[in-house]
Every structure is written in C-alpha cells, then in structure tokens.
From Swiss-Prot:
NADP(+) binds at residues 45-48, 68, 76, 78, 108-110, 158. Pathway: Amino-acid biosynthesis; L-isoleucine biosynthesis; L-isoleucine from 2-oxobutanoate: step 2/4; Amino-acid biosynthesis; L-valine biosynthesis; L-valine from pyruvate: step 2/4. Involved in the biosynthesis of branched-chain amino acids (BCAA). Catalyzes an alkyl-migration followed by a ketol-acid reduction of (S)-2-acetolactate (S2AL) to yield (R)-2,3-dihydroxy-isovalerate. In the isomerase reaction, S2AL is rearranged via a Mg-dependent methyl migration to produce 3-hydroxy-3-methyl-2-ketobutyrate (HMKB). In the reductase reaction, this 2-ketoacid undergoes a metal-dependent reduction by NADPH to yield (R)-2,3-dihydroxy-isovalerate. It is an enzyme of class 1 (oxidoreductase). It comes from Escherichia coli (strain 55989 / EAEC). This is Ketol-acid reductoisomerase (NADP(+)). Keywords: Amino-acid biosynthesis, Branched-chain amino acid biosynthesis, Magnesium, Metal-binding, NADP, Oxidoreductase, Repeat. Its cofactor is Mg(2+).
Length: 491
C-alpha cells in the first residue's frame, strides 16, 4: 500500500491540508438521531473505546463491543471493562455482520490487521469509523468502495471525553469524511451524529479532513505536546540540581509546574500565562522565548517536513516490524533518567511560586506553542486545527506528568505519539544544552527581583504577545469551552 497523501497531486494535498471549518451549533440540531435504531459496534475497549461507548450509549445509541476470540476466552482487560459496564460483547464474526457502523478504536499499529479482518465481515453499505486517520493517510489502507469511512477525533484523552460528558458538556472534536469512501453521501450525517453522541458538539466541532487531522496531530504531539515537555523536564531538572537545588524540590517544581503554568494557558492563552509574571519576569520570559524559537525553529520544521513527506511514518512502521526495538529502548532509557528517579518532595509549593521560579519553563511553553502553531500554518494547516493540536491539548498532557511524571505521559499517549516524542526530545536536549549553560540567576529556581521596567519595552512586549495569531484564534475557540472544568491538581 502507498501513503495516501503522497498519491495526491499538489492541489489535492493543499486542499486537504487546508480543510477546516468551525461548525455552527445549529448544524447539530438533530443530535445523534441519524444513528438511533442502528447498530454501532466498537472494536477495542481502551480509554477512547470505553469512554466513547459509554457516552454514545447514554445518548441513546445501540452499542456493543467486538473483541478477538482470545481476549474473550482469557477474559482480558478489554473484555472485563466492556462487560463490567454492561455492554454486549462478542467476537468479530458474531457482531460485525450486523453492524451499521463499525468504530475502530484500537492502537494505530493494530489498525491494518483489524481492518483487514473486519472488512470481509461488514455488510454492504456499512460505515467504518476512526478517531485518528493514520491508517488511512499514512498506511494507505484501501477500504471497500461500498463502505463509508468517517472520523470523529476528540481532542482530549478518553477519560476527559467521559468526564466532560457527565458534566453535561463535551470536548472539542474534529470530524471528517474520507473523500474516496462516501458512496451514498451520508458520511457527514454519520460523523455529526457520532460527534453529538459523544458530546463533542457542545464544545465546538471542526469539519476537517483525514489528512489535516493526521498531519497536525502528529506535529503537535511530537513537538510541543509531548516532546517539548519531555525535553524541558529533563533539561530543567538537571540544571536545577547542577546549581545546588534539592533534587526532590526540583522534581516537584517541574512535575507540577507544567500543569500549573498551562492551567493559565488553558483559561486565557499565552497572554494570561505571561500576565501571571511580574513585569521584569515577563520581559525576561519573552526574551528567553525568542531565543528558544530561533534555536528550535529548524528542528520543528524538520519534524513537520518529515511528517508531510511520510518519512516519519515509514521510520516508525519499520520499528513496528522490528518489534518496537527503538521505542522500547527509548522508553527504558527515559525511565532511568535523574528526573524520573528523583525522590518525592513532601513540602508544599504555592501556586504563584511555580510561576515566579519557572520563568524558563514559561518561556519554553510560549516558544513551543508558537513554533508548533506557526510551523503547521506555514505548511498549509488552518489556524483552528493548529490551535487545537498545540495550545489546547497542552494542559491535558501536562496533567499526566503531574500524576506520575514522564512515565504517566508516555503510558497515556499513543505509541505513535510516544515514538515521535522520543525522536524530538532526543534531538532537542543536546540542541538546547549550550543555551542552558548561558542562563542567568532568576531564570529557573529563583524569582527575578522586582526592579525598574522600561514602559515602552513592556508596552511592545505586551502587544507582541497579544497580537500573535494563536492568541486571536484562541480567544474565539475558547469562547466555546468556557464550561470546561479546571484540571490542575498541583500543590
């Protein structure tokens, strides 16, 4: 099979990369009714599989789970989760032939095997759903022409999808129809009903494409969402300890610092995050972020180039066939780092202390968010998509680090995201070491003293922060998410 994106001509590539439309709430007036009375079979019962299924059932849909025979016979975790929540569970052969919509929510590396198994069992005119388009775009999976192929991609981990639904809300969601597989023209109706059944329509839905979702998703998770947080954690911890900070305190400042900082980001964008600093600290954070952007821009661009060309995907799929040798090696090495093995700090760190003593971390967040956004937009991805795949998801990933450090982040994210994270962080850490060596007192671990500030300089910096394109689009999109709960647990 050929990478689907690479089979398109340039005009088609640009059209699909640039497909992004914020959908009005009136477009979801019918809710999930298009799928009511139809059989929805979910393949896979992980975080997305279980939680989307719970939401869809609560929205009145007929949901069951198709699992492999051995998973049922051995009563594996997927079988236990589905049965304990009262769902009907059966083998592929028992459930797929009756399904009107088959939703594939297994890990990326399993998609080809799953799709090749279920396709012959699917009835004529059925639909196949994904929550990530990697199998279609990067693997180039060929789907039977009578089958409608759609995507509903919540921009949150599965647990958040469920929690927000239970609160009567939802999470921002991308939906798409594969242009090669919409024989009856019903793909958008199916995708809208599925999104409504998960609650996504209450938080904002973008009509996108499989291509735009995959390319932007890969870029975000490799760079700012996971790679930058991992590289920043390792660099900042080592710097603090090198300068005499208690390793336990240093570990807590970083582990909970990302979450505390990005909670401000979630509520009011980069502007609010920077406003949490004193004026001297804000000016210093801005200067550091500009330096970081200049240093890291080529690395961000390389990741985007490799994602667009398919180089990243081919390398990762080669590792799949080699029993994940690179992935497992990188995972083991990360677990042995000084940050991951540092003792826990039993004392309390006040919320403002995370800002005052984390100026460099704030600069890293600002630089990483803006670089990821700018690089995606420069590659033809629309600003709304770039926002969701950079700034919006960052607090959610930071929250995983607050739970169990980098280990938890890498467990929660997909293997695809984890592989890309390691590629980025392994390149970024040595790239930034000379920069780290030139830091000044107050950049990390100590507060910058109050002092005189040049009014004109402060005015210009404030204007530069507020006028960035991500702040403009973010203000609009956050207007649809004002009811989302705070997630920070730092203390």
């Amino acid at each position: 099979m050929a990478n689907y994106f690479n089979t398109l001509n340039l005009r088609q590539q640009l059209a699909q990369l640039g497909k992004c439309r914020f959908m009005g709430r009136d477009e979801f007036a019918d809710g999930a009714s298009y799928l009511q009375g139809k059989k929805v079979v979910i393949v896979g019962c992980g975080a997305q599989g279980l939680n989307q299924g719970l939401n869809m059932r609560d929205s009145g849909l007929d949901i069951s789970y198709a699992l492999r025979k051995e998973a049922i016979a051995e009563k594996r975790a997927s079988w236990r989760k589905a049965t304990e929540n009262g769902f009907k569970v059966g083998t592929y052969e028992e459930l797929i032939p009756q399904a009107d919509l088959v939703v594939n929510l297994t890990p990326d590396k399993q998609h080809s095997d799953v799709v090749r198994t279920v396709q012959p069992l699917m009835k004529d005119g059925a639909a196949l759903g994904y929550s990530h388009g990697f199998n279609i775009v990067e693997v180039g999976e060929q789907i039977r022409k009578d089958i409608t192929v759609v995507m509903v991609a919540p921009k949150c981990p599965g647990t958040e999808v469920r929690e927000e639904y239970k609160r009567g809300f939802g999470v921002p969601t991308l939906i798409a129809v594969h242009p090669e597989n919409d024989p009856k023209g019903e793909g958008m109706a199916i995708a809208k009903a599925w999104a409504a059944a998960t609650g996504g329509h209450r938080a904002g839905v973008l009509e996108s494409s499989f291509v735009a979702e995959v390319k932007s998703d890969l870029m975000g998770e490799q760079t700012i969402l996971c790679g930058m947080l991992q590289a920043g954690s390792l660099l900042c911890f080592d710097k603090l300890v090198e300068e005499g900070t208690d390793p336990a305190y240093a570990e807590k400042l970083i582990q909970f610092g990302w979450e505390t900082i990005t909670e401000a980001l979630k509520q009011g964008g980069i502007t609010l995050m920077m406003d949490r600093l004193s004026n001297p600290a804000k000016l210093r954070a801005y200067a550091l972020s500009e330096q970081l952007k200049e240093i890291m821009a080529p690395l961000f661009q390389k990741h985007m180039d490799d994602i667009i060309s398919g180089e990243f995907s081919s390398g990762m799929m080669a590792d799949w066939t080699n029993d994940d040798k690179k992935l497992l090696t990188w995972r083991e090495e990360t677990g042995k780092t000084a940050f991951e093995t540092a003792p826990q700090y039993e004392g309390k760190i006040g919320e403002q202390e995370y800002f005052d003593k984390g100026v460099l971390m704030i600069a890293m967040v600002k630089a990483g968010v803006e670089l990821a956004f700018e690089t995606m937009v420069d590659s033809g991805i629309i600003e709304e998509s770039a926002y969701y795949e950079s700034l919006h998801e960052l607090p959610l990933i930071a929250n995983t680090i607050a739970r169990k450090r980098l280990y938890e982040m890498n467990v929660v994210i997909s293997d695809t995201a984890e592989y890309g994270n390691y590629l980025f962080s392994y390149a970024c850490v040595p790239l930034l070491k000379p920069f780290m060596a030139e830091l000044q007192p107050g950049d990390l671990g100590k507060a910058i003293p109050e002092g005189a500030v040049d009014n004109a300089q402060l005015r210009d910096v404030n204007e530069a922060i507020r006028s960035h394109a991500i702040e403009q689009v973010g203000k609009k999109l956050r207007g649809y998410m004002t009811d989302m709960k705070r997630i920070a647990v730092a203390g």
